């Protein structure tokens, strides 16, 4: 009876857990699979959108792109070279696609959906303007969209976001740790009111403050630089981290601190050698929060940074990879996958500390 009772319990648990996991993980699956799909497959709505396809749903031929001769090209033997990152254009309509053909016996891959190649019309052959001289087969799945990111400032944006996040973490920890300890342990008039006021400042929407902050960074002449973000982000990471760490410091038994003081330690030595090792999970939790918030923040980065090279990753992706109402979904999803890796790594390496820190800080 006990065995079947446990089986029913597991089945019930998984019956609720599996739909939740599917709902939570589906956006990540969709982003990953989209980032590896060729454009031809990505916009072929007749195919299964949840996996890769090799052939066009209408023609049942492999996905390809036609290579055409520009109208200005002379009628002469052609040595056709495709440069890295160039996009080819189809000369036919979707209703009447031309058959796939190769030039000679060459297997030609697209520099957009494959590797860099060159195409040469056989000696003596001529091609009229706007003639289709060949096709390039489209690889699917493909790493084209990831290669395309190398031709954009994507990795520069990643560097700016990482440097900003690291600097904000350092400033937040250096200020929030002593502030939280002082409010939690030292007795002075108004410390409770100050603690509540610090937390209430976190509840103010950051979007309300970006206009006065823009005047502030302009007065310091750090606008359009990474320093405008490094000085702004701590204003909404420090209040929450201070409030969070106050709970950790209050959870440390006072007897430990009193014994350290009796042994001759100063207040700073006691904080550094005794208290901080005990509340390290809370400090890591605060650091993760500060890094995640600054790495993903959008409004301040869009307002303070105007140059392409100094943009943060969220702003750069949304501004540079969207043209009006045209969305380059392949590169967008590839950048989303790569852009999420730093946060995934940070959470993955410190997941136990983060869960312990959030639960302990909330309870204490």
Model-predicted segments: where are they?
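A structural signal for multi-pass alpha-helical bundles of membrane permease subunits
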Residues: 2-93, 98-364
């Amino acid at each position: 009876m006990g065995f079947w009772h446990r089986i029913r319990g597991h089945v019930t648990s998984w019956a609720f857990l599996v739909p939740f996991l599917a709902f939570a993980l589906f956006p990540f699956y969709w982003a990953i699979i989209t980032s590896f799909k060729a454009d031809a497959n990505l916009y072929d709505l007749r195919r299964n959108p949840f996996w890769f396809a090799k052939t066009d749903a209408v023609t049942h031929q492999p996905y390809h792109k036609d290579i055409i001769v520009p109208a200005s090209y002379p009628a002469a033997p052609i040595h056709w070279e495709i440069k890295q990152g160039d996009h080819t254009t189809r000369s036919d309509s979707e209703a009447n696609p031309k058959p796939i053909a190769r030039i000679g016996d060459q297997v030609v891959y697209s520099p957009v959906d494959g590797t860099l190649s060159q195409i040469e019309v056989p000696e003596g052959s001529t091609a009229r303007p706007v003639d289709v001289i060949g096709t390039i087969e489209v690889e699917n799945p493909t790493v084209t969209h990831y290669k395309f990111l190398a031709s954009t400032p994507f990795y520069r944006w990643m560097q700016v976001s990482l440097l900003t996040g690291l600097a904000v973490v350092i400033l937040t920890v250096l200020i929030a740790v002593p502030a939280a300890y002082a409010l939690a342990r030292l007795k002075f008039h108004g410390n409770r009111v100050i603690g509540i006021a610090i937390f209430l400042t976190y509840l103010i929407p950051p979007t309300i403050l970006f206009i006065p902050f823009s005047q502030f960074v302009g007065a310091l002449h750090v606008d359009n630089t990474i320093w405008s973000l490094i000085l702004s982000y701590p204003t909404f990471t420090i209040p929450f981290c201070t409030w969070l760490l106050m709970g950790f410091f209050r959870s440390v038994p006072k007897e430990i601190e009193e014994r350290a003081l009796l042994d001759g330690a100063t207040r700073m030595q006691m904080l550094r050698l005794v208290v901080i090792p005990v509340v390290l999970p809370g400090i890591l939790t605060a650091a993760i929060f500060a890094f995640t918030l600054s790495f993903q923040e959008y409004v301040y980065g869009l307002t303070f940074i105007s140059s392409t090279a100094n943009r943060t990753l969220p702003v750069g992706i949304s501004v540079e990879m969207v043209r009006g109402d045209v969305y380059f979904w392949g590169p967008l999803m590839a950048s989303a996958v790569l852009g999420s890796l730093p946060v995934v790594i940070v959470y993955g390496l410190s997941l136990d500390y983060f869960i312990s820190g959030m639960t302990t800080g909330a309870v204490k």
